[in-house]
Amino acid sequence: MGRARDAILDALENLTAEELKKFKLKLLSVPLREGYGRIPRGALLSMDALDLTDKLVSFYLETYGAELTANVLRDMGLQEMAGQLQAATHQGSGAAPAGIQAPPQSAAKPGLHFIDQHRAALIARVTNVEWLLDALYGKVLTDEQYQAVRAEPTNPSKMRKLFSFTPAWNWTCKDLLLQALRESQSYLVEDLERS
């Protein structure tokens, strides 16, 4: 069993019967990422913690299933439990800040961030560089860095210039770039996660 699946099961087994019922009801209305469907209501309401964990993992896969579970727990006011779930999911891989999804463990090389691991593919395939720059401006990029990247003539050269600043970045900075990529080019990120 994967770490994320175990963490989801652990969280759901620690809910009272009333909290589990509330969790399932919230799961029916929580906003989902594009491309994901809802677990059918009839099947969902009759499930225990173990069945629900299996259904979450089969419907949403481990990484997004854990993120979705943490979001629902947070909506229920169970911030501590949501934090524990995220910590257990990201343990040993350099925890991502709340709301930022880390790359799947199966695709990650020890010690390498998703951004570093897929550097060449990102340089070649990112098309919406301006959007990334706007998302990172003031948080990660200085005005001088922002202008230097924008001055490059092509998208690949802009991405190369952007990557020239990453050796000075910490995990949080790289997570912000990953989050911006997820928002602007989610299909590219999903494709790289599967590779």
UniProtKB/Swiss-Prot annotation:
User: Impact of changing K55R on the protein?
Assistant: Strongly reduced PELI1-mediated ubiquitination
Which consequence is recorded for altering M76A? Abolishes homooligomerization
Cellular location of this protein? Cytoplasm; Inflammasome; Endoplasmic reticulum; Mitochondrion
Q: What is the native source organism of this protein?
A: Homo sapiens (Human)
Give the consequence of mutating V72A.
Abolishes homooligomerization
Q: In which tissues is it expressed?
A: Widely expressed at low levels. Detected in peripheral blood leukocytes, lung, small intestine, spleen, thymus, colon and at lower levels in placenta, liver and kidney. Very low expression in skeletal muscle, heart and brain. Expressed in lung epithelial cells (at protein level). Detected in the leukemia cell lines HL-60 and U-937, but not in Jurkat T-cell lymphoma and Daudi Burkitt's lymphoma. Detected in the melanoma cell line WM35, but not in WM793. Not detected in HeLa cervical carcinoma cells and MOLT-4 lymphocytic leukemia cells.
Q: What else is known?
A: In breast tumorigenesis, methylation-mediated silencing may affect genes and proteins that act as positive mediators of cell death.
The answer, when asked if Membrane is one of the entry's keywords, is yes
What name has this protein been given in UniProt?
Apoptosis-associated speck-like protein containing a CARD
UniProt keywords (A-Z) are:
Apoptosis, Cytoplasm, Endoplasmic reticulum, Golgi apparatus, Immunity, Inflammasome, Inflammatory response, Innate immunity, Isopeptide bond, Membrane, Mitochondrion, Nucleus, Phosphoprotein, Tumor suppressor, Ubl conjugation
Where does the record place the modification Phosphoserine? S195
**What kind of modification does the protein receive after translation?**
Phosphorylated.
The observed outcome of changing L15A is: Abolishes homooligomerization
